Amino acid sequence: KDGDVLIGTTECDTLDTLLLFTSKGNYASIPVWQIDEGKWKDVGMHLNKVVRIDGEDKIKNAILIKSFDTYAWIVTVSSAGQIKKTPVNNWQVDRNNKVMTAMNLGKDAEMINAFIAYSNQQILMVSKDGYSYRFAIEDIPATGVKSKGVKAMNLGKGDSLAWGCVMNAEDPAVLYMTNVGQMKRIHTEEIVFGNRPMKGNLICKRLKTNPSIVTLAKAVSAGEELIFKDPERQVLRASEVPLKPRESGFGSPLVLKDGWNLYRGIDECRIIDIPTDVDNEVHEDVERLSLFDEKEG
């Protein structure tokens, strides 16, 4: 429909489960067999046919689950600067007629991203003012579905969290984008790696007038295709995005109109055996964890 945004497409089986994450910190669990079959370019079935959801609550991410019995986490990030990881098996539900809490958000906060993460991966954080850093996924304690998580980043006065996502240490570069569609790539080794939470380093030159507002980050390989809609579909190879040092500004390899959107796709959770020597329990004492994090860094 006009004004709607495509989250992603993927192949699936009727025995799979689709988890949908929303801006208000909720999630819906939909068995694929409950989704109506349709033809190519059909508008499709509205979520309200199977799940009650507020019309103002917008879907941000989709994750396809083949099996909840896997050694992986779903990580959620809020605009209030919190981050949470919860084992995939905690997201399985018996009833799915309404949305459920995916993250306990504070007043005026939104959930800005939800994604799958695996052992030994890294989490990348970036603030709107352009500070960024990486840390190990193990730095986030596993907590329950309804917790608010822990502090993701130390922020300067007037700054706020823009984005958080997963990456691998061997990823060659990270793409950063601003609210007006400007972009740059930075070698991964230039992005500081440390313990959560920290402020990080600037990944762009700060201008006194019309400073850049960072809104998005993504690990990329040179041959990867980036698909944008503004509302026309535009495709750009990651290699066409300027590869610049941290101290430089952003480039404009593509002219994007207001309201542009980067196609994210649907995450498919891999099935990984849970190690027998690993404690995969969640911690519910989130307030104590959060207070402890405030003293770090």
Give the location of each predicted region.
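Short, structured "edge-of-domain" segments at secondary-structure transitions
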Residues: 1-297
